């Protein structure tokens, strides 16, 4: 999945970009107060996307 598509999905689920590090962006789900680190690569593997969505307690795209 492309990073741009994942970010769009996270925003639609109500998540916000919390802070940025070297190669990762930390996303926050304000309703559950859960956070997850999202790598800034062009392509993100489906297993990684699944883990991010699971940590943030949102549906998978």
Predicted ranges, named:
Residues 1-20, 28-61:
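Basic nucleic-acid-binding interfaces
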């Amino acid at each position: 999945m492309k990073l741009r598509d994942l970010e769009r999905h996270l925003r639609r689920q109500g998540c916000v970009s919390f802070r940025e590090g070297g190669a990762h962006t930390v996303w926050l789900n304000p309703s559950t107060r859960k956070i997850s680190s999202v790598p800034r690569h062009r392509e993100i593997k489906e297993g990684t996307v699944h883990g991010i969505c699971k940590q943030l307690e949102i549906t998978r795209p």
